[in-house]
């Protein structure tokens, strides 16, 4: 509808004086630019904007934590025991730290071997290097079991 408004003043101004044209044209052009920009902005924002806003909100609100998994393991090991929010936060930080150490070590191993891909073998070696003694053996055992379960079914 905006182009119709622009067309009418242009045809009415054709018979008008030159000063009236000079005043009306900038107003008509500004109105036309606004009219053209506004629908395109709305059209662009509605389909993409909603998706982008949701994605941004999800990214902001979805902070990845291990709290749920820590709680599940706690209930498997000690069903009648609870955990405070401060202790849960400490456990979450601990897991993030260990994950970062293992990932860094696996990345280094991958670079040493001049291979672009970090495989389960690099992860296993990194776990052996990062974790001490018996803990490393149990972690490797559980990791191997998890990979076997994942690949088989």
Curated annotation (Swiss-Prot):
Family matches, as SMART domains: H2B
GO MF annotation terms: DNA binding; protein heterodimerization activity; structural constituent of chromatin
Compartments in which it is found: Nucleus; Chromosome
Post-translational modification: The N-terminus is blocked. Can be acetylated to form H2BK33ac and H2BK34ac. Acetylated mainly on the ubiquitinated form.
Biased composition (Basic and acidic residues): 1-10, 20-54
Positions carrying N6-acetyllysine: 41-42
Gene3D superfamilies: Histone, subunit A (1.10.20.10)
GO cellular-component term (any): nucleosome
InterPro entries in the record: Histone-fold, Histone_H2A/H2B/H3, Histone_H2B, HISTONE_H2B_site
Keywords (A to Z) from UniProt: Acetylation, Chromosome, DNA-binding, Isopeptide bond, Nucleosome core, Nucleus, Ubl conjugation
Region (Disordered): 1-60
Cross-link entry Glycyl lysine isopeptide (Lys-Gly) (interchain with G-Cter in ubiquitin), positions: 149
Principal subcellular localization: nucleus
A Pfam family of this chain: Histone
Its job: Core component of nucleosome. Nucleosomes wrap and compact DNA into chromatin, limiting DNA accessibility to the cellular machineries which require DNA as a template. Histones thereby play a central role in transcription regulation, DNA repair, DNA replication and chromosomal stability. DNA accessibility is regulated via a complex set of post-translational modifications of histones, also called histone code, and nucleosome remodeling.
Subunit structure: The nucleosome is a histone octamer containing two molecules each of H2A, H2B, H3 and H4 assembled in one H3-H4 heterotetramer and two H2A-H2B heterodimers. The octamer wraps approximately 147 bp of DNA.
Homology family: Belongs to the histone H2B family.
Name of the protein this chain belongs to: Histone H2B.4
